[in-house]
C-alpha cells in the first residue's frame, strides 16, 4: 500500500519530484524521462485513464501488470465486489456465480478502507453473496465503522445467511449507525421465489433472515427485480410485503 502523486503534465511531474513523493502515477501517452532525477516508483498509464483523480484508490496486480479502480472519491456510486461465489443461481443474474477461491478480495478491501475519504456519503458492497465468508466480511464492516463512520453502508445480499442467529448477532454487534442489508424477495409464494433463484428452501431462509434482522433492530431494504417471471405477480407481491413485512426500511 502506497500513496502516489498523480501527474498529467511535465509541471505536475516536476512538482511531485520537488515535493519528494516516493511514487508517481503519470497519465500520459508520451515517454517520461526522469533519469537521474527520480529514484522512486514511476508508473505510466495511457490517457484513457484520465478519469483518475486525487483520492482515488487503485489496486495493482504486479503479475499481470494491470490495475483496477476500487474507489473514486468524486463518484456518488462506489461499489466494491466482495466475491463471485453465491448460494443462489438467479435465472436473470448478470454475473453468474463462480466456484473460485477469491477470499483475497476481502483482505484487499480491508487494506483499502483507511484510504477512503471519510466524507464519502455512501458505499455499497456487492457480490456474489457478500456473506459467503461472513466472519471476514463482518471484519470489513467493522473496519467501515471505525474508518468511515459517517458513510452509509449498503450490503447487497440474498439474506439467507441471516437465518443463522450467530451471523445476525455478529452483524448487530458491529453497531454501525448507517448499515443497511438490501435483500431481494422475488415473489409472495415460496415456489416462485425458489424457482427464480434456483435454490430450494431459499424463500424460507430469506424471510427468516429478514425477521431476525428486524427483531434485532437492524435496517433492511426489500428489493424486487422485475422480469418475465416476477412482473405478472408484482401487485400480489407488493400486497404481501406490505401485509407481512411492514416494518422494513425505506431505501437510502
Describe the predicted segments one by one:
Residues 1-76:
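Flexible, acidic/Gly-rich N-terminal and inter-domain linker regions that tether
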Residues 54, 81, 85-88, 95-96, ...:
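A structural signal for the main folded, soluble domain(s) of proteins
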Residues 70-106:
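Canonical Radical SAM [4Fe-4S] cluster-binding loop centered on the CxxxCxxC motif
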Residues 94-105, 118-133, 144-164, 175-207, ...:
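Core AdoMet radical
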Residues 140-144, 171, 210-214, 241:
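Hydrophobic positions in alpha-helices of CheY-like receiver
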Residues 164-170:
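Alpha-helical scaffolding within the catalytic cores
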Residues 169, 228-244:
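Catalytic cores of alpha/beta
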Residues 170-174, 199-201, 239-241:
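Short, hinge-like loop/turn segments at secondary-structure boundaries
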Amino acid at each position: 500500500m502506497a500513496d502516489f502523486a498523480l501527474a498529467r503534465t511535465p509541471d505536475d511531474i516536476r512538482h511531485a519530484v520537488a515535493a519528494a513523493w516516493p511514487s508517481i502515477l503519470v497519465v500520459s501517452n508520451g515517454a517520461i524521462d526522469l533519469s537521474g532525477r527520480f529514484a522512486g516508483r514511476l508508473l505510466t498509464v495511457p490517457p484513457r485513464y484520465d478519469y483518475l483523480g486525487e483520492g482515488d484508490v487503485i489496486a495493482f496486480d504486479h503479475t499481470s501488470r494491470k490495475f483496477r479502480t476500487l474507489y473514486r472519491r468524486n463518484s456518488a456510486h462506489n461499489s466494491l465486489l466482495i466475491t463471485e461465489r453465491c448460494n443462489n443461481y438467479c435465472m436473470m443474474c448478470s454475473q453468474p456465480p463462480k466456484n473460485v477461491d477469491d477470499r483475497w478480495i476481502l483482505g484487499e478491501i480491508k487494506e483499502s478502507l483507511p484510504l477512503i475519504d471519510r466524507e464519502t456519503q455512501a458505499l455499497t458492497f456487492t457480490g456474489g453473496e457478500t456473506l459467503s465468508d461472513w466472519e471476514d466480511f463482518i471484519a470489513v464492516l467493522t473496519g467501515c465503522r471505525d474508518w468511515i463512520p459517517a458513510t452509509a453502508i449498503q450490503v447487497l445480499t440474498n439474506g439467507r445467511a441471516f437465518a443463522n442467529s450467530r451471523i445476525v448477532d455478529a452483524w448487530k454487534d458491529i453497531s454501525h449507525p448507517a448499515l443497511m442489508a438490501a435483500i431481494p424477495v422475488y415473489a409472495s409464494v415460496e415456489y416462485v421465489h425458489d424457482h427464480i433463484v434456483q435454490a430450494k428452501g431459499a424463500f424460507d431462509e430469506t424471510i427468516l433472515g429478514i425477521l431476525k434482522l428486524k427483531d434485532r433492530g437492524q435496517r433492511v431494504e426489500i428489493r424486487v427485480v422485475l422480469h418475465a417471471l416476477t412482473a405478472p405477480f408484482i401487485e400480489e407481491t407488493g400486497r404481501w410485503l406490505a401485509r407481512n413485512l411492514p416494518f422494513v426500511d425505506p431505501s437510502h
